[in-house]
Design a protein with these regions (language model features):
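Active-site-proximal substrate-binding groove within the catalytic cores of carbohydrate-active enzymes
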Residues: 4-27, 104-107, 118-173, 179-434
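Aromatic- and glycine-enriched glycan-recognition loops and surfaces
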Residues: 12-119, 196-200
């Protein structure tokens, strides 16, 4: 159905540059991050969307996508677009797909397309005919593109086609469209329903180009057209309804049912659903852009994405909650439980504990071998039951995913693995017959 298995991948955004030209990561630095993530995750499939790849950085010059950010190029390349081609090509060595974070909703007066979009009346207008303002992003006032008028006029196809000529997105097979929500235009008589129909046409065109589209949050009308959103706003009923291979989500940054949600900036409460109470019980991944703190990002992989990939191999069957616990039952005899008082998460499969708070012992399911990853935030003495697929293993191999792959001591007795982990460290463990 989709080009990629998003529910079995580490999907994230990397922050390159804010406007005007405030560089955080160059294309070379991004490749180094990708390489290090590959080494620390046993080569998990990565899908990395670049934020701020264009013009002067994130949210600059929309609706134009015609120029790669010169601040990010390698010294040896003549043009920034050559450097981006290089990054997209080299990332494949690390089981990584690199693509773009773009926007089809916003327009700025500084854009080279501004005059054209005003001339052909492609912007959303208020009832009195004035241009409808969007947010102020990076110090610039944004206005809103009428997707319905832009699609009808052919300009949407034109800028998609031009982008596909500029960069090998068809080869990447995925793109992330920021925001991507219906924008009614009162002056033009364009309704939410009109916009939603247009959005489906736009997604259909991307798909005809063999490219998946991911976005920021869910609209129910788009399930089956979008494989994944960065901020998952599904409630419990929808998480039971949709299999993760059809519709999955990243993290919970905009989960409006979290206790701290009342302290966040308003605006996103208008989303179709408010989210669920304890998203970790269902499986959640990362949804904070990677800047340069790779240690924190790696911890999120072990504590979020690794359980996310594991739980997404099963179907959520039922959900229950008491005054003390919040539980989800999955197929495969898998159970998750959150202790409400301290939000302590446990995950079990056939009564075998595989996640205990910030201690994790889970299979690397993207590998053909029977390898497991163990991680601990606090460190200390670990004891985990030998996985049933290991059979009657008498001893194991293990090595650190940090410190250059140093061999780690692991003992096995009475079907229990025992070893010591330093705080915020991970090892890979495999049976001796491998």
């Amino acid at each position: 159905m989709y080009r990629h298995e998003y529910h079995q991948s580490l999907v994230y955004k990397t922050w390159l540059c804010g406007k005007p030209g405030k560089v955080v990561n160059t294309f070379e630095q991004v490749l180094d991050h990708i390489r290090r993530i590959h080494d620390q995750t046993l080569g998990v499939p990565q899908i990395c969307y670049l934020v701020g790849w264009q013009f002067e950085g994130h949210d600059s010059k929309y609706p134009a996508w015609s120029q790669v950010n010169d601040h990010l190029k390698r010294p040896e390349d003549a043009h920034a677009v050559d450097s981006l081609h290089w990054l997209m090509r080299e990332a494949k060595r690390y089981n990584a797909t690199v693509s773009l974070h773009i926007n089809m909703c916003d327009a700025y007066e500084s854009s080279p397309l501004w005059d054209e979009y005003v001339k052909f009346d492609l912007l959303v207008r208020e009832a009195d005919g004035s241009l409808k303002k969007g947010g102020i992003w990076g110090g610039e006032q944004s206005y809103l593109v009428s997707k319905t008028r832009e699609w009808a006029g052919g300009q949407a196809k034109e800028r998609i086609d031009a982008l596909l000529k500029l960069l090998p997105l068809a080869e990447s097979g995925t793109v992330h469209i920021d925001v991507f929500q219906p924008m009614p235009s009162l002056y033009h008589g364009i309704t939410r329903e009109d916009e939603m129909a247009t959005m489906k046409s736009i997604l259909g065109y991307w798909r005809s180009c063999n490219i998946d589209v991911t976005s920021e949050w869910w609209h129910h009308e788009l399930v089956g057209l979008i494989p994944m959103v960065y901020h998952s706003n599904f409630d419990e009923a929808s998480r039971l309804k949709y299999p993760p291979g059809l519709a999955c989500g990243g993290g919970s940054a905009w989960n409006m049912r979290q206790p701290e949600s009342d302290s966040r900036p308003g605006g996103f409460s208008r989303l179709p659903e408010p989210g669920c109470l304890f998203e970790e019980a269902w499986g959640h991944s990362v949804d904070h852009d990677l800047h340069q703190d790779l240690a924190k990002f790696s911890e999120q992989f072990y504590l979020r994405t690794l359980p996310f990939i594991f739980l997404n191999r099963f179907r959520a069957l039922s959900h229950s909650q008491t005054a003390k616990t919040y539980e989800v039952q999955f197929s495969g005899d898998v159970w998750t439980q959150v202790h409400i008082a301290d939000r302590h998460l446990t995950i079990r499969q056939q009564d075998r504990l595989v996640v205990d708070g910030s201690n994790v012992f889970l299979p690397a399911l993207w590998r053909k071998d029977r390898e497991y990853i163990a991680f601990s935030r606090r460190g200390g003495e670990m004891a985990w039951t030998v996985p049933p697929e290991w059979g009657a293993a008498q001893w194991v191999h293990s090595k650190s995913l940090f410190n250059g792959g140093v061999e780690e001591a692991v003992t096995i007795a009475n079907d229990i693995l025992k070893f010591t982990l330093l705080p915020n460290s991970a090892i890979v463990v495999r049976p001796s017959d491998m």
